[in-house]
């Protein structure tokens, strides 16, 4: 899902509630502070390399049964590029968290620690990412009227149903 939809919050909850699990937030792999981020192809490739390295490490570690990963994956090519870099077989569930544009705007503009210019820039990018997420072949979860706890429960039910 797009930035501001609740991916990190939900993933933290999932990791806390599921035994022998670990989480990776893709933003950790190219965090650029509070300044305007560089979204060039060079930095995207660096982020994908870093993410793949960490995911492969987690998947190979027998201490973890479940790896929760969150990142803005709004293009099928990003997902394919990342999956092609993973070396160990695993069960894969891809959820896209979405919400209405009004709810997304409210969430972004209520975020602490961002300047108004940063919020405007995030809102612009988030709108583009939201439409891309809706087009992917994933399990879409509309979080507009849900709490993070509700979304966490829905994901756990879908994962454990298999």
Language-model-derived ranges and their functions:
Residues 2:
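P-loop (Walker A) phosphate-binding loop of NTP-binding proteins
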Residues 5:
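ATP-binding Walker
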Residues 8-53:
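Conserved substrate/cofactor phosphate-moiety recognition/catalytic segment
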Residues 29-30, 74-75, 98-103, 146-147:
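Conserved nucleotide-binding/hydrolysis micro-motifs of P-loop NTPases
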Residues 46-89:
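Glycine-rich phosphate-binding loop used to anchor ATP phosphates in small-molecule kinases
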Residues 64, 88-93, 134-138:
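Short glycine-/polar-rich loops that comprise or flank the Walker A/P-loop
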Residues 71, 88-108:
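Conserved phosphate-donor/acceptor-positioning beta-strand/loop module used by diverse small-molecule
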Residues 113-154, 162:
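Small-molecule kinase domains that catalyze NTP-dependent phosphoryl transfer to phosphate-bearing small molecules
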